[in-house]
Amino acid sequence: MKAPLRLILSGVLVVLVLASAVLWLTRPEPGGGPGVAIALPAGTKIGGAFNLIDDQNRPVTEQTYRGHWLLVYFGYTFCPDVCPTTLQTIADALDKLGKTGAQITPLFITVDPARDTPSVMARYVHQFDSRIIGLTGNDAQIAEVAKAYRVYYAKETPKDGTAYTMDHSSFIYLMDPEGRLAALFGPQTTAKELAAAIGQKLGQDK
């Protein structure tokens, strides 16, 4: 087999493997509607230790929130589209949950710590809901928590010199009071779907 042909076939194989992985990661649970709880391969670990600063400039760790249900989302305040949409979805879902929503602590963790200081995070998240807590930190701290939650993010600087953006994955993580992943939701999940799934999970915990 000639070298160019081998390279082409190798490239096709890589694309097929990646496509299969994406399809597995984003497939819904049996019986679920579009965007509802994503099923992960058995043994997949998401979540873990972190050391960050909240939007009131207080140091926090994963232990700060132990005993609480968490709704975690990663993004940044300069995000033009998916972040504000998702935060609004989270806020609306909490409203739909009524009193049950009080059991949830929503966390918005930045992937752009250079611009997202505690005060910037506070102003931003409270536009959506006063219950949402913004978390930031230094580059190493953000890299650590992103790795624990398997979050992809990368800085993208336009050639025209305009402000940079952050490319990042967009999933909502429901973590149980012991810090374990209870459910994972994709970016197309509606507030109604999110509220229903959370209500079901919390009901199972009783």
Indicate where each model-derived feature is located.
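C-terminal alpha-helix
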Residues: A197-D205
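Short, small/polar residue-rich loop motifs at catalytic or cofactor-binding pockets
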Residues: K45-G47, W69, D167-S169
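Short active-site neighborhood of thiol/selenol oxidoreductases, capturing the structured segment around
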Residues: E62-T86, I90
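Thiol/disulfide oxidoreductase modules built on the thioredoxin-like
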Residues: Q141-A197
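Structural microenvironment flanking redox-active thiols in thiol-disulfide oxidoreductases
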Residues: T85-V145
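A short beta-strand-turn-helix
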Residues: F50-L70, L94
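Hydrophobic beta-strand anchors of alpha/beta hydrolase catalytic cores
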Residues: L71-V72, P106, I172
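N-terminal targeting signals for export/organelle localization
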Residues: M1-A49, D205-K206
